């Protein structure tokens, strides 16, 4: 990192001049970012097929949309491989609740880059945004486990409640709507003097809080 900064800051020759004389390096991470390491096995192991086929799981608690982004296993030492091989696709996919708790340790949740996926599945789910919202889902699930005095696997009958709580906290789950009976906005009649096609005012309260495909889900 310091060698690269030395080049950016001090090199002033021809096309390689970066005009960084007045810039300063304020912070460098103490540890290198680890793209992947050990993963735990849950009741379900998310695969590349699930991602590419945009599977909507009945117990979905998280979603992702990053490409299946594979990097050379040995980094710079893999001279015959491309540094990164990105397999792009359209749309988003969901991650099931069963990928977030351990298969054989009854009171253990996972969140982040250690969830139950194949290596190709992790190539998409490892992205920070996906890890963050997965962590939020696990936190809500843990609170429900406390409420019902149960282990993670035993929470399965309450997964719909978990999903609705995620949506209530401004989460998003493709294929699921806010169905909270106490949410009065869902019962309101919403009108406007004008709108664009696809942005009809009633969609403000259709229970979906994100744009999905061509549907704006907002006014």
Tell me what each language-model feature is.
Residues 172-219:
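Disordered, acidic Ser/Thr/Pro-rich linker "stalks" and the adjacent N-terminal cap
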Residues 1-185:
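Flavin (FAD/FMN)-binding glycine-rich loop and adjacent Rossmann-like elements that form
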